[in-house]
Design a protein with these regions (language model features):
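Carbohydrate-active catalytic/glycan-binding domains of CAZyme proteins
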Residues: 1-397
Length: 397
C-alpha cells in the first residue's frame, strides 16, 4: 500500500531510532489533522495516527497544511509548526479586512511524544503581522485585474501596503539563531509582468528571525516571537502593527521559464481561475563543500496538478536575503514514463551520511498524493541532481 499524504516533513527521533513523517491529511470531521508515519529506513512506513488535536485552543478554521515537527532538547518536548486559515472572529484583527480570503497564519502545538497528540500552546497563531509596505493594491483600482492590459510605466498610483497570509513554515537552526521561513500567499499579491503585460498573483518564499527565549522554556508554554527589529518595521504611520520580513525566493528577481505553469489560467479557464505563480514548500539547510559552508533552499513551483509542478533549489552564502536559483531547475519533475506526477513540497533528511529528499507525488494525474524519497546529490552550487527515487510503502496500519 502507498503512504498517503502531502507536504511531508521527516524528523529523526534519536530516542526511538525512528524517522517520523508528518503530512497534510486534508479536512477533518474529528478535529484531528496531519498524518503521522514512522520508519526505520525511509522506504517502509507504519501508520501511527494523527498529530494535531484541535479540541483545545483551536484558532484555525480550515486549510490545515504543511506540518513540521522539531524536537527540543532543552525541555524534551516536540514542537509542531503548521499553517491554517484563522477563525472568522480573528480575521479583521490580523488583516484589517474581515473579508480577507487567504487569511492563513502559523500555529505551534507541543507534545511529549513524536506520536502526539500535539496540543496548541495557545488559542492564537504566532504573534506576527507581516505587512508588505510597497505593494500597490491593484484590486482596489481595477474591477478585474486579470482583464487589464497596461504598460508598466502607466501603472496608476493607488493604495500602497497589504498584510500577507502565511503558509508552509520551515525552521532553520544555526548556532544561537532561529529563522522562520514561510510562503506568502498569492492572494493580494498581484504583480505586473512587463513581459506578459498582465497581472499575475504570486506567492513568494520569505523569512523572519525569531527570538530564542521560547526554545528554552522548560514548561513549553511560551509561543515563538519575532525579533524586535522586525516588529512594526513596515508601519506607514498608522496605529496598527505592521511587521517586516525578508524576501528569499520570487520570480522577478531571477525569472525561470518553468515557473510559468499557471500564468494563463484566467484565459484558459474562461475567467474561473486567476493567473498565478507559486513558490512554496521551502526547506533550508547547509552543506560543507570544499571546506566552505553553503546555504541551500529547496522549494516547489506551480500547483501540484500542473505538468510543470516540480522542485527547485537555490543557494546563498548566508541564510537571509535573495538566494540564487540553480540554472538547471527543476531538479525533480514529473516523469510519465515512470508514472510519476505532481512531484513537490518535501524536506531534506540525513541518513548514514547521505542526503535524501522526501516529497509527495502521484502515480497518475488523478490519484491521491503519496510519499516518495530520492537521494539528493550536491557536489557544488552548479552540480545538483536527484537519483534513486522510490515510492514509499505502507507496511503496517
Amino acid at each position: 500500500m502507498n503512504v498517503i499524504g502531502a507536504d511531508p516533513h521527516v524528523m529523526y527521533d534519536e530516542k526511538s531510532g525512528y524517522y517520523y513523517c508528518y503530512a497534510t491529511s486534508g479536512d477533518s470531521d474529528t478535529g484531528k489533522y496531519f498524518y503521522i508515519y514512522k520508519s526505520k529506513d525511509l522506504v517502509e512506513w507504519e501508520k501511527v495516527g494523527y498529530a494535531l488535536d484541535t479540541s483545545i485552543n483551536c484558532w484555525g478554521k480550515d486549510w490545515y497544511w504543511a506540518p513540521e515537527c522539531y524536537y527540543n532538547p532543552n525541555n524534551e518536548m516536540y514542537y509542531l509548526f503548521y499553517s491554517a486559515r484563522i477563525n472568522d472572529d480573528l480575521v479583521e484583527e490580523h488583516f484589517e479586512n474581515k473579508n480577507y480570503y487567504e487569511c492563513a497564519k502559523i500555529g505551534v502545538a507541543v507534545s511529549k511524544s513524536p506520536e502526539g497528540p500535539f496540543i496548541n500552546i495557545c488559542n492564537k497563531p504566532i504573534d506576527y503581522f507581516p505587512f508588505d509596505k510597497d505593494y500597490l493594491d491593484v484590486d482596489q483600482i481595477y474591477e478585474n485585474i486579470f482583464d487589464v492590459r497596461i504598460k508598466e510605466e502607466d501603472l496608476p498610483k493607488g493604495i500602497v501596503g497589504q498584510y500577507i497570509g502565511t503558509i508552509d513554515v520551515n525552521l532553520f537552526f544555526e548556532d544561537e539563531r532561529i529563522i522562520m521561513y514561510f510562503s506568502r500567499c498569492c492572494y493580494k499579491n498581484a504583480r505586473h509582468d512587463k513581459v506578459l503585460n498582465k497581472f499575475i498573483e504570486e506567492s513568494h518564499v520569505c523569512a523572519v528571525e525569531l527570538n530564542t527565549e521560547w526554545w528554552f522554556d522548560k514548561d513549553a508554554k511560551m509561543m515563538p516571537t519575532i525579533k524586535e527589529k522586525f516588529i512594526n518595521q513596515n508601519n506607514l504611520g498608522t496605529i496598527h502593527r505592521r511587521d517586516g520580513f525578508i524576501n528569499i525566493i520570487n520570480h522577478s528577481n531571477q525569472p525561470q521559464e518553468w515557473e510559468d505553469g499557471h500564468v494563463n489560467d484566467y484565459e484558459l479557464s474562461g475567467g474561473k481561475s486567476p493567473n498565478r505563480r507559486w513558490f512554496e514548500g521551502s526547506t533550508t539547510f547547509t552543506k560543507i563543500i570544499n571546506d566552505k559552508k553553503h546555504y541551500f533552499v529547496l522549494y516547489s513551483c506551480n500547483y501540484y496538478v500542473n505538468e510543470l509542478y516540480g522542485v527547485g533549489i537555490a543557494y546563498n552564502n548566508e541564510p537571509l536575503g535573495f538566494f540564487t536559483k540553480f540554472k538547471r531547475n527543476p531538479i525533480i519533475k514529473q516523469n510519465p514514463i515512470k508514472s510519476l506526477y505532481s512531484t513537490g513540497h518535501g524536506c531534506l533528511v540525513e541518513k548514514n551520511g547521505e542526503s535524501y529528499y522526501v516529497f509527495h507525488g502521484r502515480e497518475t494525474k488523478t490519484s491521491d498524493r503519496v510519499i516518495y524519497v530520492g537521494k539528493i546529490n550536491i557536489n557544488s552550487e552548479e552540480d545538483v541532481y536527484v537519483s534513486d527515487i522510490k515510492q514509499c510503502k505502507l507496511v503496517s496500519f
